[in-house]
Amino acid sequence: MAFAQSVYNQSSVLKINVMVVDDNRVFLDIWSRMLEKSKYREITVIAVDYPKKALSTLKNQRDNIDLIITDYYMPGMNGLQLKKQITQEFGNLSVLVMSSDPNKEEESLSCGAMGFIPKPIAPTDLPKIYQFALTYKRNGKSTLSTEQNQKDANVSVPQQIMLVPEQAYVLKTKKKNCSSKSDTRTVNSTNVSHVSTNGSRKNRKRKPKGGPSDDGESLSQPPKKKKIWWTNPLQDLFLQAIQHIGYDKVVPKKILAIMNVPYLTRENVASHLQKYRLFVKRVVHQGRFSMLSDRGKDSMFRQTHIKEPYVNYYTPSTSWYETSLNNRSFYSESVHGHSRLLSEAREPVRYNQMSYNYMNRNISFENQPSQNEETRTVFEPPVMANKISQTSQVLGFGQLGPSAISGHNFNTNMMSSYGSLTPNQPGTSHFSYGMQSVLNNENATYNPQPPANATTQPNLDELPQLENLNLYNDLGNTSELPYNISNFQSDDNKKQGEEDGDWTFVNINQDQSNGESSNTIATPETNTPNFNINPNQNQGQAVPEFTDWSFLDQQELVDDDFMNSLFNNDMN
């Protein structure tokens, strides 16, 4: 008898009574047949086509109904209003809302519905509905007591039941109230294998702080400490205290005593002191790193070279350009007492006497006189010429070779030379004799005193001549010369000139009958209207400079490409 009673109780538990409310009779019939003819034979469907009829049915069969499924759109009363009315009259019953509008899902769940079923219903939804209803029946349709509801009256998040993960799209929970009168409830699941609640371990309601816990123990927490804002006046007091005590001897207790601020505690000062020490350590580290990095920098970056530029007072000797052809490195002198080694060894030459900025490579040459005129051997004009040439330093040019004479560098009463051709420099010939007097006094009449061994022509007696300038004798028996000079004939009373390209060869012969050698001088032809070497003209004008070619290498004199490139650079 007892065994039969237990079997009956077990079978009664597996039987589920579901009430379906829908105003569409066709859908209601299909829905009822699907539930009844499913493999779950224990489901009994109560079909109702009107909301008010559903309320009357609940009055008669309240204890026999385990689950209510209602449509959202119905005449006279929608599904949410029906759910609210059922809650007011019959307590908390499980209600599922179904609708073809997916936008009603959130509203339904927020108003207390246990789940939402989209229309049309698929056959896969049937087992989920059965499991949902079975869970409620096994729990004995348990709801929270009145006391529990009163305690949770201020809780806005209802605890709702969710099915297994595959049923997540059917039943969802939202944390929102439908109205101020909606009841809240919590249903605890005992079948963990099938049902999980939103009030799981993560979302279980926390009891107020200081209230009784589940084991009866009260956990009292200390109040939170008040946060201290270190304002500027408070920070000034803190720094003054550190300065008074000393950074090495400072401790929080002494700082607190000196500051004498009532609301400060020792912990506040200790925390702030620790942060301050970390800040000081970081500043010191950055300072050391910057000092090590600046040690390798050039000293010119630490000087005021932009506002007060450096000036070179050295005598210009090779070129007025800032670099020579071979990029030889020179050092300039600072007028502010700084080191001369302001530039690196690879820095190009800045060898002029005008003020310039080290950071600006495009310097402009101003019209300035030399600062050390007493040491010059070549006249420097007070006004620069319009065109500046650069003397080559290849094979001694510029030091001992010919000066690059531009056609626009000669004025009426002065001549500009770019070669430092003094007798003190080593070389095969010194032809600055007779030039010093006219260069030092440009307005004086040029009357040179040639040396005893210099050979002159009677018609060119006022021109400075060079000694031992026989180019043919210096080259020996070389068969190839850069220019043919065999056609020049000696003449005692006049000079012969043959123009070959841009160069004029002048043959000066004094007396070949006496066995003396003739001198052949090659000079660049200048087309300036202000330059004239006619001896009959006024000798107060500037006289061109004659250069010596005898010291050059024979192979390079034979090379036409070398000579043409050299002449073109000098003439340009």
Curated annotation (Swiss-Prot):
Pfam families recorded: Response_reg
Taxonomically, the superkingdom here is: Eukaryota
- Does the record carry Transcription as a key word? yes
Q: Which UniProt keywords apply?
A: Activator, Cytokinin signaling pathway, DNA-binding, Nucleus, Phosphoprotein, Transcription, Transcription regulation, Two-component regulatory system
Query: What biological process terms from GO does the record include?
Result: cytokinin-activated signaling pathway; phosphorelay signal transduction system
Location of region: Disordered: 175-225, 509-531
Reproduce the UniProt comment on modification after translation: Two-component system major event consists of a His-to-Asp phosphorelay between a sensor histidine kinase (HK) and a response regulator (RR). In plants, the His-to-Asp phosphorelay involves an additional intermediate named Histidine-containing phosphotransfer protein (HPt). This multistep phosphorelay consists of a His-Asp-His-Asp sequential transfer of a phosphate group between first a His and an Asp of the HK protein, followed by the transfer to a conserved His of the HPt protein and finally the transfer to an Asp in the receiver domain of the RR protein.
Principal subcellular localisation of the protein: nucleus
User: Which part of the chain engages DNA, per the record?
Assistant: 227-277
| One GO CC term on file | nucleus
Q: Which PROSITE patterns match?
A: RESPONSE_REGULATORY
Q: Localized where?
A: Nucleus
Under SUPFAM superfamilies, the record lists: CheY-like (SSF52172), Homeodomain-like (SSF46689)
Where, per the database record, does this protein carry 4-aspartylphosphate?
Answer: 71
Molecular-function annotations in GO: DNA binding; DNA-binding transcription factor activity
Where is the Response regulatory domain positioned along the sequence? 17-134
InterPro entries in the record, alphabetically? ARR-like, CheY-like_superfamily, Homeodomain-like_sf, Myb_dom_plants, Response_reg_B-typ_pln, Sig_transdc_resp-reg_receiver
Question: Quaternary form?
Answer: Binds the target DNA as a monomer.
PANTHER family found in the cross-reference section: RESPONSE REGULATOR 23-RELATED, TWO-COMPONENT RESPONSE REGULATOR
Function, in words: Putative transcriptional activator that binds specifically to the DNA sequence 5'-[AG]GATT-3'. Functions as a response regulator involved in His-to-Asp phosphorelay signal transduction system. Phosphorylation of the Asp residue in the receiver domain activates the ability of the protein to promote the transcription of target genes. Could directly activate some type-A response regulators in response to cytokinins.
State what protein this is by name. Answer: Putative two-component response regulator ARR13
What is the gene called? ARR13
